Regions:
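Solvent-exposed, non-transmembrane regions of integral membrane proteins
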Residues: 1-431
Length: 431
């Protein structure tokens, strides 16, 4: 071992050594602090990594001239496979272990938390193996660049490896530099909101962009009718609760041996107390609820017929159910949101004002920030006057995109490139 050309034993030993050092650091120092490798420390570390690869390339080139294989291990397939295998093993463990933020695991004495298995991305051994894989990838790419031939296959190899290196390198650089803030804006506020809560420090900070909520809107799925037990509130049947969606009127359906007929549906309504009953009338103002006039007939006992109004309720008006028997009631569940969005005004530091609509799952790109529609006041529902947004900025993101672009170019070059001679010969022999 450690004599002559390095083999798999040496490669695996390096992985074990890095993992052992990482475990010691994890036990002694705890997880990696969130800001430990933020700017400018990530810039210094990244520069040292690139300098190490450059110096390796210089010494490797000198060794080649002297017909020496002293530095060839790091650009060989053994180092590549063992470095990938070590990091892949950690990825499998991470997939099988519930991951929590490193801050939540501090002070917990269970070995899973003490060893960092529950917060793998903040573990020292993960960082060391990631850096080793990145260094090996850089050495492999440098070695190929020194032996580059002007053909499509070599070009594809370089594009793929350079692209992967750039994507992984800038992904590492940005991991501690991503800025995430949560901001709550209100439509009834007279002033825009400049402050956000830093998701790492949990402190309120002023941001270079302000947001004013003009209007919050929700598109909902049709409300659903269900039959529940009065004493437990559980929907029937217990094994697989059924419901009737009010997507049109009139409509009918069967729930647990009750035929339900929807005679009318008012998406915006309020209860009106008459002389002998409660009815619903159209009401397009704050707190308006979905309501439906229904008729329910027991299929086992046709003489049991009940009719009346049901509503989902809101933060202003209580829900209303229809009692079918002493133990059963027909209720309307709150409609599920289909899409929600915020119409906002955006204020920049230089005084410029813009307007935009932020949709859920469709972030808004604004002056280097990604603004996500995160949540709203669930209690108020579609009448929510509050919208919760998340503002994210990653200054290294374009580097990751560049790496992905080079990977795609390399894949296209491989696809369009000529068939290797050995493969072509095999096809001809087969024919």
């Amino acid at each position: 071992m450690w004599q002559g050309r390095f083999g798999y034993r040496e490669g695996i030993f390096i992985i074990y050594g890095l993992a052992f050092v990482g475990l010691l650091l994890q036990v002694i120092a705890g997880p990696i602090p969130a800001t430990a490798f933020a700017y400018p420390f990530n810039l210094v570390g990244g520069s040292l990594l690139l300098a190490g690869i450059l110096f390796w390339g210089i010494f490797h080139r000198r060794a080649i001239r002297r017909n020496s294989a002293r530095f060839s291990f790091l650009s060989g397939h053994i180092a590549t496979l063992t470095s990938i295998g070590g990091l892949l093993l950690l990825a499998v463990i991470m997939g099988l272990t519930k991951q929590i933020p490193a801050e939540m695991g501090r002070g917990l004495q269970h070995p899973i938390h003490r060893l960092g298995l529950s917060s793998m991305l903040s573990a020292w051994y993960f960082l060391l193996l990631y850096l080793y894989l990145l260094f090996v990838l850089g050495c492999v790419t440098t070695d190929r660049l020194m032996r580059l031939k002007l053909n499509l296959r070599d070009g594809a190899f370089v594009m793929n490896h350079v692209g992967l290196f750039i994507a992984l390198f800038f992904g590492l650089m940005s991991s501690a530099d991503i800025r995430q803030y949560r901001m709550q804006v209100y439509s009834d506020s007279d002033y825009p909101e400049w402050r956000g809560i830093d998701q790492r420090t949990k402190k309120m900070v002023e941001l270079p962009v302000a947001i004013e909520l003009k209007k919050f809107e929700i598109a909902e799925y049709p409300p659903k009718l269900m039959i529940i037990r009065n004493n437990s509130g559980k929907a029937l049947p217990y094994s697989r609760p059924a419901h009737l969606s009010i997507d049109r009127t009139p409509s009918k359906g069967t729930i647990d041996r009750w035929q339900i007929e929807v005679l009318a549906h008012l998406p915006y309504s309020a209860a009106v107390v008459t002389k002998d009953s409660v009815v619903f009338r159209e009401f397009r103002s704050l707190g308006a609820v979905h309501s439906a006039r229904v008729r329910a007939a027991n299929l086992d006992f046709p003489q049991e017929v009940v009719s009346g109004w049901v509503s989902s309720g809101s933060h202003v008006f209580p829900y209303r159910s229809l009692r079918l028997t002493d133990s059963l009631s027909l209720v309307m569940a709150e409609p599920d949101p289909k899409q929600y969005s915020s119409q906002v005004y955006l204020y920049a530091e230089n005084g410029e004002i813009d307007s935009a609509t932020i949709l859920v799952n469709k972030p808004l790109r604004y002056r280097g920030w990604y603004i996500y529609q995160l949540s709203y006041n669930r209690e108020q529902g579609r009448w929510s006057t509050m919208s919760e947004l998340e503002l994210v900025k990653d200054d290294w993101l374009y580097g990751v995109y560049t790496g992905i672009g080079l990977l795609l170019i390399g894949a296209a070059m491989l696809f369009l490139g000529p068939i290797p001679a050995s493969t072509q010969a095999k096809r001809e022999d087969h024919d």
